[in-house]
Amino acid sequence: MSPTISHKDSSRQRRSGMFSHALDMKSGPLPPGGWDDSRRDSVGGEGDREVLLGDAGPGDLPKAPRSYRSELSSILLLLFLYVLQGIPLGLAGSIPLILQSKNVSYTDQAFFSFVFWPFSLKLLWAPLVDAVYFKNFGRRKSWLVPTQYTLGIFMIYLSTQVDRLLGNIDGRTPDVVALTVTFFLFEFLAATQDIAVDGWALTMLSRENVGYASTCNSVGQTAGYFLGNVLFLALESADFCNKYLRFQPQPRGIVTLSDFLFFWGTVFLITTTLVALLKKENREASIVKEETQGITDTYKLLFSIIKMPAVLAFCLLILTSKIGFSAADAVTGLKLVEEGVPKEHLALLAVPMVPLQIILPLLISKYTAGPQPLNIFYKAMPYRLLLGLEYALLVWWTPKVEHQGGFPLYYYIIVLLSYALHQVTLYSMYVSIMAFNAKVSDPLIGGTYMTLLNTVSNLGGNWPSTVALWLVDPLTVKECVGASNQNCRTPDAIELCKKLGGSCVTALDGYYVESIICVLIGFGWWFFLGPKFKKLQDEGPSSWKCKRNN
């Protein structure tokens, strides 16, 4: 189904191209690190300082609050940087739908799903990004500029190779391994850019206006994701363009993936050059110095947090809590494409979801603001599990309503309503987990603590989706019809069946088997482990405080 336009780390992580994908938890930047090096003049370390605009030193006179208009250029720059960040995320999210239209195996789809992991794993290299930099160039620009240059150059080069990788030349099969490596690098670079931009946002704006950073983040990445996914899939589709945008039909869409990559690669190079030359970072020695922490100390701190009994219990439970949703979230959208639903129509269904996705967190937060936010998670879980079965029924029903190669309006209305109900349950669980993570995080090390909990929450959605995709093919039973004494258990057997005049027919679709198994596992978790998960709310504050050896 349509990709969810989601909060980023999201992968938003939000996983696009699926019927619905896990929301990535927003994780704030880690405490800036110091890198002890003899070349302090050239590489930032403990002696460097970043401006937090609006801070005043002890001897300074208080200044009048800054209007957002006085920093409009910085706000617009942040917004544009987040838009650029959303482009590779959206493009990566469109590839599964394109691959599915080319009839690749679900094993290949599972392999490609590793592309969506970097945003959930960026905690592993965030301390490095925060600590190592060139002082004279700027703490954030030291990573932002080379990262975006690499993205731009890579996009332009890929524009010359993507048709071959997708199998558009000479009817070859898509090179899934090369596509996975390529877009994994895209996501890795986008996650690195996210770390740098999040950190820069805190010092680019004054304290009065720093709240606009989260708005730029949400709006910018959503817009970029929309451009790279929904808009691209629509303009790339010959059927969509011929039906809605052209007077004379053409055999291809208005844009191709290679055109799109070349255009945005050029935009990345031009804008990055302008940022490198024209935008300066705030580095006044008189401003209060940020708390810094060494790279090694940061990793030691993370390990100390994980070893705490309460945190370890949370990690184990949250890593298994989303198994029940994996078939519905990861496979349903691809199954709809397999049944003939145009991928661009599924992508466009994300558009009416945007207002709902904005309103839902505001409404749900009223119920998660109390001392027991996980109650909402527990109450929403069975409804989301039942919607997984409804998704399976929707896939089963899809070929029965197809008419002359298309689908009636009422079909899309039912799909949209199903999607909206799913979003209500998904956001209820997402917001409650975010509220719980914020509630238990040790305020003395809030950035690192919160990021760790959110990272584990993201991984709890990533690995079940990958496994769910991987298991579809092994659970599917196919029979060779028209050729005696043949089967369709392996690719070679399928080829032999066709050569002997037969055809492989699906007797039992692994998606339905998996949907039932996942729901049973999900209800088992809800019944046996759910109460233990809720009991974590009863742990005292001391259970969540990390003892640090200074």
UniProtKB/Swiss-Prot annotation:
Q: What induces it?
A: Expression is induced in presence of ceramide.
Task: Return the Pfam families for the record.
Answer: Acatn
| Glycosylation, residue list | 103
Q: Which reaction does it catalyse?
A: acetyl-CoA(in) = acetyl-CoA(out)
Q: Which Gene3D superfamilies is this protein grouped with?
A: MFS general substrate transporter like domains (1.20.1250.20)
Instruction: Tell me what topology the record assigns in the membrane.
Output: Multi-pass membrane protein
The Phosphoserine modification is found at 42
The places in or outside the cell where this protein is found are: Endoplasmic reticulum membrane
Please report any disulfide bonds recorded for this protein chain, giving both cysteine positions. Answer: none
Q: Which UniProt keywords apply?
A: Endoplasmic reticulum, Glycoprotein, Membrane, Phosphoprotein, Transmembrane, Transmembrane helix, Transport
Q: Where is the composition biased (Basic and acidic residues)?
A: 1-12, 36-52
Q: Which GO terms describe its cellular component?
A: endoplasmic reticulum membrane
Which GO MF terms does the UniProt record name? acetyl-CoA transmembrane transporter activity; protein homodimerization activity
Regarding tissue, the record states:
Expressed in all adult tissues examined including brain, heart, kidney, liver and spleen, with maximum expression in liver and kidney.
Topological region Cytoplasmic: 1-74, 135-141, 197-217, 278-300, 366-375, 427-509
Subunit structure of this chain's protein: Homodimerizes.
What does this protein's UniProt record list under function?
Acetyl-CoA transporter that mediates active acetyl-CoA import through the endoplasmic reticulum (ER) membrane into the ER lumen where specific ER-based acetyl-CoA:lysine acetyltransferases are responsible for the acetylation of ER-based protein substrate, such as BACE1. Necessary for O-acetylation of gangliosides.
Q: Which family does it belong to?
A: Belongs to the SLC33A transporter family.
The identity of this protein, by name, is Acetyl-coenzyme A transporter 1
The species is Mus musculus
